[in-house]
Every structure is written in structure tokens, then in C-alpha cells.
């Protein structure tokens, strides 16, 4: 009897000693410092600014210290009791990498998937680590076990996959249907002339540049012919063209001819036109531009234009050569007469082509400009000429431009 009682007494003494030693350690470590900080402070007693304590949240005021925020990457997750807790041995293992915590179900091995009805299989510590990332397949929710730090409990969260990753297949299908319906509606409202306008604009083809010989022509008329209420570029009126480069004091002439035959954009017939010969002995002037009321325009291909001979250095104001563009197409009205009165023109002129009822045939006339009397934006004599451009201070006429400088017949 004495021996058991002595054993019990020794156990009680050991427990008391252990409890008292824990209390002393707690006071030394500073765990009780927040409790002491809540006690009233005597105003008469002086305190130092520095308190040798481990807890940095202790302040010298009567306010309750704010608990420190959670570390980054450890959100507050509510613990659910529906799922079985993993064994306690997992808490002493190091934390798994983030890729193992939230691995998507599509790339996990097949053996890692098991239904929630199957009991957890006993495994080694290494196998138990991989089991913490197991996805329990359910409909429509999925339970994901996340392994946190070594001193935290393993917490199970329930995630609704439908809310996190919405199905975008239906939205994509609706978008494609709406886009297709809009395109069909637009195509239904457009006629053949609108399609011709889209495919034959000057900016798209980039081969032809518009010029005009009428002083009343404006920019949009240089690009399009007005047909009723719709604007369609008049590409069905193609023509042959001759470009002459003539040097003063010489008898040689360089003639470039190019015949162009193209299927009409608005009709199913083919149109071919020829150019009457031009007398180059007489230099035409601006009087060949025609009456102001007539609407005339032409289209000159860049390849047909020649570069003026720059082997001889010229000064501003000297005449060295001219560019003469002569194009002719169709027949004019009875009131209009062509500048070339030769009899060969009447013989070689093709019969009047069939044109739209609200449009008149166009007759193209000659234009001549001196290339060596104009200076470019850098103050040099123009050498390379091209067709196109529009003058800002002059009314648009039959003109050419040198580099960036636009040249017109003259102000009006």
C-alpha cells in the first residue's frame, strides 16, 4: 500500500512542477505580454520607450493591439466536417509545392482519381503527400484537399467548378451566328454596283491615278461617276493612250503605246477602244481643255510615263522638254467637237458603244505641260513625273504633279 501511494505522490509532484515551469517559461517568452499591455498604466510611473519583449505588437497606450495579418498565400478557409480528416502524420510533413496543390484534373494520372464512396487507402508518407491533392469527383461540385504549411491543419474546401470556369462554348456559337447573320444581311442589301465599287476603288487597285480636263470637276468626281443615287467607279470606259516625250531642237520622238482591253465591270460585254494618231508638230496649249461645262477625266498608268532626260543640267526657267498625254474614248454630243479634225479619226473611230441611259459618252482631249519649268518642294527642277494628285489653291484640271508638288493649269 505504501509503495503505490508513494508513486501517486511522486506523479502529482511531477505534474505540479511541470505546470509551474510552463508558467515561468510563458512569462519569460513574452506570450503574456499582450495581457499585461491591457492593464491600466500608472501615470506617475515612468516607462522607457523600448520594452525588451519578443512580441512587437505591444504598445505604450491603452488600445488593444491589432492581430497581425495572415501571411501571403494562406487565405482563411472555412473548415467543413463533411469530409474525413487526413491522418495527423501529414501535419509534420513539409508543404507541397503550389503546382501539386491546385493541379487541374485534366493532367492528373488516372490512378489518382477515385470516387468519394471509396475509403482512403493506407499508404506510406510519400504516397500520403500525393493523396492530399486528390480530386474527389462529384456532380456538380468538386472537393479539393489543400496541404498548407507544416504547422497548419489540412483543410478541405468545396469548389463549384461551374461558377469558377463558365462554359464558353455556347457564347462562341451565339457570336458566330450573330456575325454570320449580319454578313448575310449586309450582302443581301448590296447590289452589283456596290460590289464593283468595293473591288475597283483607286486606293485598292493602286495602278491607275485619276486626272481630269474639266475646270468644274471636284475630287469625288475624279474618282467616281454619279449614277442615280449610287456612286460607282467608271472602269468600263477603258482607252488606248499615247504619251509623247519631245525635246526642243531635236527631231526624234519616243512614242509609247499601250492598248488595254478589259471586261466591263457592270455589263457582260467586252469593250475595246483605239486612239487616233496625234499631230505632235504643233504644241497644244491650255485652250484644248474644252468648255467648263463638260465633264472629262482620264486615267494614266504610271508605267506609261517617262522620265525626262537628266543628262544635261538645266536651270530654273529653261525649257528642255514637254510631256504630252493624248487619250480619246467614245463619242461626244453633237455640240462637242474633238480637237483633232483629221479625216483619219472619223474612219478609225469605233462605233458608239452602248452606255447607260443617264450617262453620256466621254471624249478625251490633249494636254501639254512643260516639265523643266517647275520646281519640286526642294527647289530642284522636276525630272520624274507621275499622274495624280489634287491642287489645293487651284481648281482641279487636267494636271500632273512632280514628287510632292501638285501642278495645275492655273488659278481660276
Curated annotation (Swiss-Prot):
Keyword Signal attributed: yes
Superkingdom to which the source organism belongs: Eukaryota
InterPro entries the UniProt entry points to: ShKT_dom
Biased composition (Polar residues): 124-134
UniProt domain ShKT: residue ranges: 371-408
Composition-biased stretches (Basic and acidic residues): 348-357
Region (Disordered): 85-134, 250-294, 327-357
Signal peptide: 1-21
Record's keyword terms, sorted: Signal
Bias type Acidic residues, positions: 330-347
Biased composition (Low complexity): 88-105, 250-259, 266-293
Protein name: Uncharacterized protein ZK1290.10
Organism expressing this protein natively: Caenorhabditis elegans
